[in-house]
Amino acid sequence: MHQGSPTQIAEAVSKGNADFAIATEALHLYDDLVMLPCYHWNRSIVVTPDHPLAAKQSVSIEELAQYPLVTYTFGFTGRSELDTAFNRAGLTPRIVFTATDADVIKTYVRLGLGVGVIASMAVDPVSDPDLVKLDADGVFSHSTTKIGFRRSTFLRSYMYDFIQRFAPHLTRDVVDAAVALRSNEDIEAMFKDIKLPQK
């Protein structure tokens, strides 16, 4: 198991140096990879309890634009969707710090360096009781995490098992049907009516 940027892990799989790439960004750049959608996720806004946004039920993109932001480095963990949301609103985010890891971002928020924008699943009420999590579903569109592997890969039983443990809807039959399709656009069409898990 190796962590890297989406481009690094997709490249590793494309070259045969890894079996799978699991990412939200950049996998579409590799036509030689079969990409299967695993789950949808969105972001949350995290602040300290004394922050002016902490008392709000929901936050608009206009309100968010008024504060310094701490979020993921571009190319990691759905960062492009954050940029798209601000561009769509005609706003420029004030990003003061970036990191590849949600725990680092939460530390910056705790230090008062900015408002955090991270994956919702990265905020845990047990380990993060000192942070206030605000829903950002109305601010950002969801992202989809995918698992990718080389189209030429002979999938062994343990590989099918790994895929299905990671994404239970990706049974052996579903994976085989997707692999038989000609392109990732066809795979996207195959999954358009399948309700993916939300994390």
Identify the meaning behind each predicted range.
Residues 13-22, 43, 91, 109-116:
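Alpha-to-beta junction loops
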Residues 5, 60, 100-101, 119:
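Short loop/turn segments at beta->alpha junctions
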Residues 1-29, 98-99:
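Central regulatory/effector-binding core of bacterial HTH transcription factors
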Residues 1, 87-96:
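A local structural motif
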Residues 32-43, 47-69:
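Flexible hinge/capping segments at coil-to-helix
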